[in-house]
From Swiss-Prot:
Keywords: Ribonucleoprotein, Ribosomal protein
InterPro entries reported for this sequence: Ribosomal_bL36, Ribosomal_bL36_sp
Organism this protein belongs to: Deinococcus geothermalis (strain DSM 11300 / CIP 105573 / AG-3a)
Family: Belongs to the bacterial ribosomal protein bL36 family.
Highest taxon of the lineage: Bacteria
Gene Ontology biological process: translation
GO molecular function: structural constituent of ribosome
Keyword hit for Ribonucleoprotein: yes
GO CC terms: cytoplasm; ribonucleoprotein complex; ribosome
Pfam families reported for this sequence: Ribosomal_L36
Protein name in the entry: Large ribosomal subunit protein bL36
UniProt keyword annotation of Protein biosynthesis present: no
Amino acid sequence: MKVRSSVKRMCDNCKVIRRHGRVLVICTNVKHKQRQG
């Protein structure tokens, strides 16, 4: 899980979603997991 000020999709499988007021990126590739913080 990377914590970034700006989350971006890194590949076609990445999805940008909002959970509990946080912006997250979930992906089949574990290295692409990000959250905004």
